[in-house]
Amino acid sequence: MVIVGIDAHTRRHAAAAIDKHGRVLEVIEVGAGVEELDRLIAWITALGSTRLVAVEGAKGFGLALTRRLLDAGERVVDIATHLTADGRRSSRRRGKDDEIDAITIARVAMREPDLPRLTADQLDADLKLLVDARDQLVAEATRVRNRLHALLLVLAPGYRDDIAALSSKASLATAKRLVMRGRAAEPVRAKLALAAIRRLHELGRQADDLEVEIKSALAARQPTRLLAVCGVGPIVAAKILGETRGVERFPTAAAFASHTGTAPLPASSGQTTRHRLNRGGNRQLNRALFTVAMVQARWNPDARAYLERKRAEGKSPTEARRCLKRHLAKVVYDAMRADAREARIRAAA
């Protein structure tokens, strides 16, 4: 068994091959261009038939390389940067450079057998791109809305009596009328406010167009079980699928929960058994599960009963919600596994 560790960067990638005992076989460094990536893949192929490739930054600087590795049929796992840092600290070889990191990445993969494998599911990759683009538009709209709010406080004091929130087309139309009234006294502020209103309309149209694309891409995926979960609408489902990148990468629901940051971390010592909050994991998935938990806490009787049981056990409201998120991680995992099985059946038919 040969394990290849790759430390990916914007301009160059360092790769190290080790055997099953952790001994270094060979180290290579290549550029990030297409020809250099092909040379790296050819080098990996020549190492033998049984191999595993571990990439740090597989979804970042190493994304182009990872896609080519998957297209070439390689088994690829993603190594989180904190695992590399932990491995480097525990090594007898001190210091840090790309070669040391590549060797460390390979050794991390050797001792961590349950690392999630990467897949070449283009539908999930497209969902992530679309959802990320929409999230950026929504975030920009929030910033523009805040600027407009600050301008309206001077242009139209007390404007909140007429406008509850600067979110709908009707509210923006009312805001425009208020701006026009105060235009003579504050021409510069009025000009900036009108530009902000135009920008909000534009961002809204772009976000709506992306939502249509997201729903279309989601329909091709047919996640019927996932969408049946209370609180999981099209946008949340697309976020979960895009960030998960193939549920079958995770052998168990516990592994998925750990990836989402909803599984508490053991912090026991001696006779004391306790757990602490997990602040790691994929925070986008964690956020999506938080959204589902908040919806269920309001509308799902089973979720409300679950929260009441946790409160009766002595947990605080926040702790009870964390327990619900951990429970929902399993519910979502099971739903995605069921959808994946149905997709395989459809493909085989």
Residue ranges: model-predicted function:
Residues 129-225:
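Glycine-rich, often acidic, oxyanion-interacting loops/wings at catalytic, nucleic-acid
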Residues 35-52:
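Short, basic/hydrophobic alpha-helical segments
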Residues 10-35:
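Short glycine-rich, Thr/Ser-proximal phosphate-binding strand/loop in the N-terminal lobe
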Residues 1-19, 105, 137:
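Gly/Thr-rich phosphate-binding beta-strand-loop-beta motif of the actin/hexokinase/Hsp70
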Residues 37, 228, 234-235, 239-317, ...:
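Phosphate-backbone recognition surface of nucleic-acid-processing proteins
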Residues 77-117, 125, 129, 136, ...:
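Short alpha-helix plus adjacent loop in nuclease-associated cores
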Residues 312-347:
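Basic, amphipathic alpha-helical segments enriched in Lys/Arg and hydrophobic/aromatic residues
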Residues 49-61:
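Short glycine-rich phosphate-binding loop at a beta-alpha junction
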